[in-house]
């Protein structure tokens, strides 16, 4: 199997071009290639193929083989791949994802894509669509918004704000994100009974009205160096809690992303880098 390893702010995936390769069991392949000791080493597998709705279609598989709806860092790398590998010559493209069609603007330097701006669409705040339920398992009303909501995890009470960007996110504000015990608390949120489909969790430190720092525990992949949808959800949570303005520079372990919310259209835009690391071939056992 031919592959290309790419990353967006350190959120790394193995990319397979389905115009050239055939994958019978991508979930199993994702588990195999993601292993950082016995495989290629990545946060998962992303396939790039044809779409009858958009210019391209991407599918995302986590390191545990589960399929994700959307990946913000991954979709920027898809844009770089299709342009740099001459599958398109357009700098405005559309990509079909599990969370709908996304529209991307490619910024090109010396015939290579360096940055990508993604229209991440509208944030989803309806609890049943995220999904998130009450601690007793009952449903929130559709017009309720889970903002600064108490949640018990690890014998502590926290406050979270829940947003979906096509996949579920719980955002928690902390004082010191660098020293936060992510490995301890991340799994407790991911598998909490309030999240019927599990959740991604962002732990966020506010630096100013236009700047924040975050770490992310991803559903199915543990801590990753960056999460594009999570960064968008984080900025929406900051705005909903009146902690920042509508345009925020977010520092992640693997780099920086700029997120802008446009109230007039209710759309979130993400701008950030995409990097190709290397290409190769691997025998899937």
UniProtKB/Swiss-Prot annotation:
The gene is dapF. Keywords: Amino-acid biosynthesis, Cytoplasm, Isomerase, Lysine biosynthesis. The active site is at residues 71, 227. It is an enzyme of class 5 (isomerase). GO terms for cellular component: cytosol. It comes from Agathobacter rectalis (strain ATCC 33656 / DSM 3377 / JCM 17463 / KCTC 5835 / VPI 0990). It catalyses: (2S,6S)-2,6-diaminopimelate = meso-2,6-diaminopimelate. Homodimer. This is Diaminopimelate epimerase. It is found in: Cytoplasm. InterPro entries: DAP_epimerase_AS, DAP_epimerase_DapF. Catalyzes the stereoinversion of LL-2,6-diaminopimelate (L,L-DAP) to meso-diaminopimelate (meso-DAP), a precursor of L-lysine and an essential component of the bacterial peptidoglycan. The lineage of its organism: Bacteria, Bacillati, Bacillota, Clostridia, Lachnospirales. HAMAP family: DAP_epimerase (MF_00197). GO terms for molecular function: diaminopimelate epimerase activity. The keyword Metal-binding does not apply. Pathway: Amino-acid biosynthesis; L-lysine biosynthesis via DAP pathway; DL-2,6-diaminopimelate from LL-2,6-diaminopimelate: step 1/1. Its EC number is 5.1.1.7. Its main location: cytoplasm.
């Amino acid at each position: 199997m031919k592959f290309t390893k790419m990353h967006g702010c350190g959120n790394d995936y193995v990319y397979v071009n389905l115009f050239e390769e055939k994958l019978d069991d991508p979930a199993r392949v994702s588990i195999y290639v993601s292993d950082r000791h016995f495989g290629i080493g990545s946060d998962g597998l992303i396939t790039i193929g044809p779409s009858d709705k958009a210019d391209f279609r991407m599918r995302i598989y986590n390191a545990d083989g589960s399929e994700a709806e959307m990946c913000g860092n991954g979709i920027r790398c898809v844009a770089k791949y299709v342009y740099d590998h001459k599958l398109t010559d357009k700098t405005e493209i559309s990509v079909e994802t599990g969370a709908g069609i996304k529209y991307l603007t490619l910024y090109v330097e010396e015939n290579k894509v360096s940055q990508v701006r993604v229209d991440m669409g509208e944030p989803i705040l309806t609890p049943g669509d995220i999904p998130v339920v009450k601690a007793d398992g009952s449903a929130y009303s559709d017009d309720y918004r889970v903002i600064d909501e108490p949640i018990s995890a690890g014998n502590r009470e926290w406050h979270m704000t829940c947003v979906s960007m096509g996949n579920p996110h719980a955002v928690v504000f902390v004082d010191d994100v660098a020293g936060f015990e992510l490995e301890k608390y991340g799994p407790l949120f991911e598998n909490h009974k309030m999240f019927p489909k599990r959740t991604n969790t962002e732990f966020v430190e506010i630096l100013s009205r236009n700047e924040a720092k975050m770490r992310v525990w991803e559903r199915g992949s543990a801590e990753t160096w960056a999460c594009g949808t999570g960064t968008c959800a984080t900025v929406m949570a900051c705005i909903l809690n009146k902690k920042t303005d509508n345009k925020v520079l977010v520092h992640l372990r693997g780099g920086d992303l700029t997120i802008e919310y446009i109230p007039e259209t209710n759309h979130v835009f993400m701008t950030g880098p995409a990097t190709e690391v290397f290409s190769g071939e691997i025998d899937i056992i």
